[in-house]
Amino acid sequence: MGASASVLTGSKLDAWEQIRLKPGSKKKYRLKHLVWASRELERFACNPELLETAEGNEKLLQQLEPALKTGSDSLQSLWNAIVVLWCVHNRYKIGDTQQAIQKLKEVMGSRKSADAAKEDTSARQAGQNYPIVSNAQGQMVHQAISPRTLNAWVKAVEEKAFNPEIIPMFMALSEGAISYDINTMLNAIGGHQGALQVLKEVINEEAVEWDRTHPPPVGPLPPGQIREPTGSDIAGTTSTQQEQIHWTTRPNQPIPVGDIYRKWIVLGLNKMVKMYSPVSILDIKQGPKEPFRDYVDRFYKTLRAEQATQEVKNWMTETLLVQNANPDCKQILKSLGPGATLEEMMVACQGVGGPTHKARVLAEAMATAQQDLKGGYTAVFMQRGQNPIRKGTIKCFNCGKEGHIARNCRAPRKKGCWKCGQEGHQMKDCRNGKQANFLGKYWPPGGTRPGNYVQRPAHPSAPPMEEEVKGQENQEQKGGPNELYPFASLKSLFGTDQ
């Protein structure tokens, strides 16, 4: 109890004992309430020593406040006691617990407003056009670009030349810069003078277009008013730093000359990128053994340098990415369908062209060939000697089904000969329906004769004897009675030739 009682001493303890528990109540806070609060905090796994300071009380209130909606009356009483103790530590004059809660809400509300105003101020300061900064007197002054930024820009141009990634590099380093700073960055480049000359031509064209679309006002300017910027003023050749700052930061109709000049530079950089990257997106094709990931990297790097709108680039991606892939990847990509994402494509084509993919393709090809030749050898390997090639489907002698031979048949093995069904011999030695030759041997299975035998039986060319006799009888019926001896004349020998 001594440790708990040491939370408040002296005048703070006197102020604590003058606060009522409820408005209009006679009961007031006592030392026993501090002891009870300490024990409750230990029960809730909180540190009771936090009650000794105002900051500790705020931490306890922040931790207990989320549980008030679903907490018990004991938790609500603990939270009220800590609020009153927080007011005592801060020496706020309160009369009861309700006033302490109202005081806490007022203080927390004012803190939130101050934090919001501070964030708004910092956001406005961050939104100012750096390197245009405000000095102590509130005037807008220019802060020169740092040597580190120039060094990073020069090193990027030397290493990357004018690859597509040089454009976002320029945009990042020249953020908020005025025309004077941008010209400093361009003058720091030692090489690539031909490319810089192309850039200057683009800047001159854009300056002429600006003068055409923004003609200067007719007549003299009012006193104290600065002139409107021309194309050469935006390029920084005929304007000073103070004029550029004034055009950018003036309250009425500001003109961000630095941002406009950056857009002109980007147009020139796009032409330079196209000049240094002459490869067309149509020429980017995946090699036979090139991984799909490397092909995608080359494709998008070239697409980045293309001078086209985003809609055209999307069409190129949807069409050419699949069309220029190698046959293996193209077959996989077409099976995914037209709505597949790039992530799905890269996952599906992962490993294509490598040893694992080659082994899988070879295994699939062998499985297909084995399925076509299921049941044994082809007819070419089954022929023996001069026997003709067997055509048609293969038929099993064991079960009688087509598509496999008896060697690979899964049906139970049939006993005996597969042709006649008798036991004691095999089908190749079966004599059922066979004819023996003059040596007493049977013809080979299949019914065909050896190669040195005539494969087809010989048929006589003369007409049969029955047809000859029948023809002579018909001829006798047609003859007259005078021909008693038809065989005695020459006509019987030569027919109608006499």
From Swiss-Prot:
Comp. bias (Basic and acidic residues): 467-476
Q: What else is known?
A: HIV-1 lineages are divided in three main groups, M (for Major), O (for Outlier), and N (for New, or Non-M, Non-O). The vast majority of strains found worldwide belong to the group M. Group O seems to be endemic to and largely confined to Cameroon and neighboring countries in West Central Africa, where these viruses represent a small minority of HIV-1 strains. The group N is represented by a limited number of isolates from Cameroonian persons. The group M is further subdivided in 9 clades or subtypes (A to D, F to H, J and K).
Q: Which UniProt keywords apply?
A: AIDS, Capsid protein, Host cell membrane, Host cytoplasm, Host endosome, Host membrane, Host nucleus, Host-virus interaction, Lipoprotein, Membrane, Metal-binding, Methylation, Myristate, Phosphoprotein, Repeat, RNA-binding, Viral budding, Viral budding via the host ESCRT complexes, Viral nucleoprotein, Viral release from host cell, Virion, Zinc, Zinc-finger
Q: Which residues carry this modification: Asymmetric dimethylarginine?
A: 413
Q: Where is this region: Interaction with Gp41?
A: 7-31
- This chain's protein is named Gag polyprotein
Q: Which domain of life is it from?
A: Viruses
This protein's encoding gene: gag
Post-translational modification here is noted as: Gag-Pol polyprotein: Specific enzymatic cleavages by the viral protease yield mature proteins. Capsid protein p24 is phosphorylated possibly by host MAPK1; this phosphorylation is necessary for Pin1-mediated virion uncoating.
